[in-house]
Amino acid sequence: MADFSDFHVADIALAGWGRKELNIAETEMPGLMATRDEYHAAQPLRGARIAGSLHMTVQTAVLIETLTALGAEVRWASCNIFSTQDHAAAAIAAAGIPVFAFKGESLDEYWEFSHKIFEWPEGQPANMILDDGGDATLLLMLGSKAEKDIGVIAHPTNEEETALFASIKRHLAIDPHWYSKRLEHIQGVTEETTTGVHRLYQLEKDGHLPFPAINVNDSVTKSKFDNLYGCRESLVDGIKRATDVMVAGKVAVVLGYGDVGKGCAQSLRGLGATVWVTEIDPICALQAAMEGYRVVRMDEVADQADIFVTATGNVGVITHEHMKKMRNNAIICNIGHFDSEIEVASLRQYQWENIKPQVDHIIFPDGKRVILLAEGRLVNLGCATGHPSFVMSNSFTNQVLAQIELFANGHKYEKKVYVLPKHLDEKVARLHLARIGARLTELSDQQAAYISVPKQGPYKPDHYRY
């Protein structure tokens, strides 16, 4: 460790604390630990050089060490400026793994760190990407476009693009082919979250996807667990740590009723809030109504609720006009990947009073205040520590299996977006049952024949909706 300096963390002295938390997390991540045991001898990721862009948490540290245990080399950055747990990053750095992340990065630092994961020593380029939100993939693709036409980064439309475009220009000034030289070596990407998956499908639709991609998000053991049950616990954890507010008796509006929104609504109702839901999709709206939630329009209830949570993955769902109407001390937060769901930029014209890290009072001219959490970024990671280890073991076991598949068999895939096969989805679930004392019933030969499925699965067709 004395000679290792290829990292940037808040405080390397936190490594001991981080290691203790990693040891605890491993006991709650049976899927990852079983995957280490199963594949360690084969070393299926030997030769893989993975550029990782995903929240640098304790749970992610267990993922990173699983990848390296299976033979991979890894360089890592966080995919959010507020989501890093500094002791986890320190533990990874102390283990000799390059990591570039600390809680509270500036946007300029964020994009510089995103470049760092592609800057491998001795001219060895990354050949795999593990992405969360698509920023690592976007960086190489946009930079490659800018090599041919600098005009694509000439006119930033927001603060994020300003930092990104400036970072690309700096690297092009050093090497006019910085991005294309790295892009050509990438064999594939595995994408963690809904927002990043949307980007990949759009690239595929436009014919611009440069390599195969595996959509980890839509594995059942990711989206129906991480997105639903993870958010069900981590949303209120973030709100409570940030504000100490009594949720019971409050009116809460959840914007979006997908898997994430469903988990958020359940947790808020479980603590005694009256929960309303906004939706654009009639099916999701009907689901919400059948669960007993009132389905409303934001422009009609902005002045009637106490807590607002965005969970849409879209842009501008809470507007400046909505916030002008809100009650004094209304709490506004987001649990979607990017900070675009709330029009935070429109609030910069007003006075900001920082209460503590990631908690701000926005003071309007009439003296009214609203409480903005994590500056509109992920509240569960900005104001708390994200999802529990057990549910992240589901998601990250999928990630490891996807990395193994793409690295070993990427040449068999077209430049399209794929999902993991059903038998692997069921395998991930199976690996987690014993930890919670669940025992499966086994089909008899007669029963298996009657419903026309193999005794050991898969048990459902690909189109089955869990």
Swiss-Prot record:
Keywords: Cytoplasm, Hydrolase, NAD, One-carbon metabolism. Transmembrane segments: none annotated. Its cofactor is NAD(+). Substrate binds at residues 57, 132, 192, 222, 226. Binds 1 NAD(+) per subunit. One of its GO terms (biological process) is S-adenosylmethionine cycle. One of its GO terms (cellular component) is cytosol. Pfam families: AdoHcyase, AdoHcyase_NAD. NAD(+) binds at residues 193-195, 227, 256-261, 279, 314, 335-337, 380. It is an enzyme of class 3 (hydrolase). The keyword Hydrolase applies. Its EC number is 3.13.2.1. It catalyses: S-adenosyl-L-homocysteine + H2O = L-homocysteine + adenosine. It is found in: Cytoplasm. Its main location: cytoplasm. Pathway: Amino-acid biosynthesis; L-homocysteine biosynthesis; L-homocysteine from S-adenosyl-L-homocysteine: step 1/1. Belongs to the adenosylhomocysteinase family. May play a key role in the regulation of the intracellular concentration of adenosylhomocysteine. This is Adenosylhomocysteinase. It comes from Chromobacterium violaceum (strain ATCC 12472 / DSM 30191 / JCM 1249 / CCUG 213 / NBRC 12614 / NCIMB 9131 / NCTC 9757 / MK). The gene is ahcY.
